[in-house]
Swiss-Prot record:
Keywords: Chloroplast, Electron transport, Heme, Iron, Membrane, Metal-binding, Photosynthesis, Photosystem II, Plastid, Thylakoid, Transmembrane, Transmembrane helix, Transport
Cofactor binding description: With its partner (PsbF) binds heme. PSII binds additional chlorophylls, carotenoids and specific lipids.
Known role: This b-type cytochrome is tightly associated with the reaction center of photosystem II (PSII). PSII is a light-driven water:plastoquinone oxidoreductase that uses light energy to abstract electrons from H(2)O, generating O(2) and a proton gradient subsequently used for ATP formation. It consists of a core antenna complex that captures photons, and an electron transfer chain that converts photonic excitation into a charge separation.
Binding site for heme: H23
Gene field: psbE
Protein name, as recorded: Cytochrome b559 subunit alpha
Amino acid sequence: MSGSTGERAFADIITSIRYWVIHSITIPSLFIAGWSFVSTGLAYDVFGSPRPNEYFTESRQGIPLITGRFDSLEQLDEFSRSF
């Protein structure tokens, strides 16, 4: 190696106590935050996706498949009217 960039070696980083003190707090915190974001239903509201019990309503029980190649717009309009 001709020069040094001044960065610490990866082995030095992962064997340091400071690294594990910081990451033993942040990694579980991120996991808990993500789990609560999904389990409370906030993820459905933020991203606008339907909740698991909203995929199939009483009036619409079939799977919305587009089967025709040339009449796909009509099938899509038909499907969107059922909302």
